[in-house]
Amino acid sequence: MSEWIYGFFMAWGMFLAIPCPKKIWSESARRRMLACLPLVGLIAGGVWALCAWLGGFLPRPIGALLCAAAPWLVTGFMHLDGFMDVCDAVMSRRDMETRQRILKDSHCGAFAVICMVLLALGQWSVFLSAEGIALWPLALVPVASRACAALAVLTLRPMTTSQYSAMERGGAPVVFAALVLAAACITAALVWGSFAPVAAAAVYALAAWYGVKQLGGMSGDVSGFALTLAELGGAAALVLWR
């Protein structure tokens, strides 16, 4: 049980910009840290849903901007870094070795900037179109996206340069993440009649498959790429599927 508690606070400290009440680290709890990602997602989702509610009291363009930026601000833009890195690498259309080298390059290329602009415009446009829609299901979209992230990192073949390449696959953390994903999807459907978490999971799966195919394995950057697109997909499904 202590490793699960360690894993939760480790995930909070690493993947949220909100100050963690207890800063701890245990190397043996790294797999539990990944399994606790969806619990951290519940915190991020709560902030996102609250911002969506507050945005209803603001002029629509400003409210849409708040909703679009909230999931990025609450994580300190961590997953956007992976999104931009993967876009740079994949859109270079070079051989596998070069794409992997570009992925690890700390410089920001033109492809990353262009994709980031398109992502921001897409997310802002989705929320600008959300007039008269209850956005509370947003609370569970980050839960679903992070449960998928945990499943992907703990089960898919890792990239040789990934920090998770030596980590043991499978086990209780995978079962826990799968159960949380199912709970998020079922809860959203029963409580709000929304399939936003399902849409987020589907987009994550497609994006992760594409990233792994293009870059030769799973990594934190590929997960961030898929997670970012998954949250856009979940929000779009919530707003556009009326």
How does the language model describe each region?
Residues 92, 147-181, 215-218:
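Solvent-exposed interhelical
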Residues 1-25:
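Membrane-proximal soluble regions of multi-pass membrane proteins
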